[in-house]
Amino acid sequence: MATLYDVPPEELIEALTETLADEDDIEAPDWAEFTKTGVDRELPPEQEDFWTRRAASLLRKVAVDGPVGVNALRSEYGTSKQGTTRYRVRPHQKTKGSGNIIRTALQQLEDAGYVETSENDGRRVTGDGRSLLDDTAGDLLTELDRPELERYA
């Protein structure tokens, strides 16, 4: 049986995005189209499926690193700020990602039953979330035609 560790993360997140798009609980709030993903960004994301893609990425991150809190996930989704994109005259500074986007997406994943809050530890994946990840990875492993992944099939 394939697990989420057996397939490339990019492929798994792409497949999870398609799966989570069908969920009623996972949908972008009204403010999401105007919100930047961090203080280092100048514009909001341009992807149409940004919210479900971020939720899929968060589900995988919580499964791999969990239990994990919002602040640790903010550090994961942050980048280095270098001043404006035009000049880049400042030295690199590490910035954190948007906590509101992460928190709201995690709350939606909780409502869908894929993530739960553990006492004083942060959030972790439920059994339903783990089975969704593993089933998606198994389906993806049979679809991928890559010789280096055949040992997992």
Swiss-Prot record:
Annotated Gene Ontology cellular component terms: cytosolic small ribosomal subunit
Pfam families xrefs: Ribosomal_S19e
Superkingdom to which the source organism belongs: Archaea
SUPFAM superfamilies linked to this entry: Winged helix' DNA-binding domain
Keyword terms: Ribonucleoprotein, Ribosomal protein
GO biological process, one term: translation
Region (Disordered) residue spans: 77-99, 113-139
Feature: compositional bias, Basic and acidic residues: 120-133
A single GO molecular function term of this UniProt record: structural constituent of ribosome
NCBIfam families xrefs: PRK09333.1 (NF006811)
Family: Belongs to the eukaryotic ribosomal protein eS19 family.
Function noted in UniProt: May be involved in maturation of the 30S ribosomal subunit.
PANTHER family according to UniProt: 40S RIBOSOMAL PROTEIN S19 (PTHR11710:SF0)
Self-association and partners: Part of the 30S ribosomal subunit.
Protein name per the record: Small ribosomal subunit protein eS19
Gene: rps19e
